[in-house]
């Protein structure tokens, strides 16, 4: 039997992915201070951040649950790009991304509080960016959307206008690779499809 799933994230996009897949869950953000963890390696960074978020939430549970933590960054030209701190930086990054290919990394952490088991993995998706004009970039930043997204774009929102194509898991670019999460659940002896019955 599948224990209750707790999503340790404030991300509306991650919530929507789970909801669309018919997976019941509850949200409990970790409010973890991401500045505590630093790394120049995107794989290490997203896995450590996802794990830290999941650990904070797992420690607060009083019943057996599965805690899912996630964190995403865009890796472009040797630079790790998380959420931009302000509109000016968002514009700079979007200009930098024009016509480039970036890699979107998402760390996935899964904690089974009943078995006291922890898994951490990552997914990577290549993102091929379009060449928006300065005017289009300013209009996009003015919507506020890129200020809430790793890498300054939301492929499931207005930012989709500026992505030519991707190679890899689409959900990963949104914030959660459901195929990877399914495999992680299986590794712990659970099936996400049990949530459908």
Curated annotation (Swiss-Prot):
Signal peptide: none annotated. GO terms for cellular component: cytoplasm. It comes from the Bacteria. CDD domains: Maf. The active site is at 71 (proton acceptor). InterPro entries: ITPase-like_fam (IPR029001), Maf-like (IPR003697). Its EC number is 3.6.1.9. Its main location: cytoplasm. Keywords: Cytoplasm, Hydrolase, Nucleotide metabolism. It catalyses: a ribonucleoside 5'-triphosphate + H2O = a ribonucleoside 5'-phosphate + diphosphate + H(+); a 2'-deoxyribonucleoside 5'-triphosphate + H2O = a 2'-deoxyribonucleoside 5'-phosphate + diphosphate + H(+). It is found in: Cytoplasm. It is an enzyme of class 3 (hydrolase). SUPFAM superfamilies: ITPase-like. Nucleoside triphosphate pyrophosphatase. May have a dual role in cell division arrest and in preventing the incorporation of modified nucleotides into cellular nucleic acids. This is Nucleoside triphosphate pyrophosphatase. It comes from Synechococcus sp. (strain JA-2-3B'a(2-13)) (Cyanobacteria bacterium Yellowstone B-Prime). The lineage of its organism: Bacteria, Bacillati, Cyanobacteriota, Cyanophyceae, Synechococcales.
